[in-house]
Amino acid sequence: MEVVAYYRISSVKQEKSQLGLEAQKSSVRAYCKAHNLVIISEHTDSAVSGSAPLESRSGLVDALASISSHGAQALLVAKVDRIARKMFVQLSIENALERMGARIISAAGEGTQEEDNPNAVFMRRIMSAV
């Protein structure tokens, strides 16, 4: 499966934490290796809040455009909260991906893989609201 990877940090201070870019990349790449996924492009937003609207996040906009133009099947993130901190923002991104025939996959496994499983969808909604 071909995927587009997306990484986000909200502050320079966060870079040195377990949510830093290198930690996210390591997690995503290990997940790809374990699940035979191929990253076709990688996109990053640095010093951007997860509550910022989509239009102010150039890395995420580029990631979605890459999925659309290359036909990737998923947007792969280290954790779901790297996509959005507000449920409405995450739902709008999920909706855009669904229209492209793609979905979100979290390397942390936060219920994002089993789209047909109501429990997984429920868990994803809970995680995006926290």
Protein language model features and the residues they cover:
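Short, structured surface patches at the beginning of a domain
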Residues: 1-130
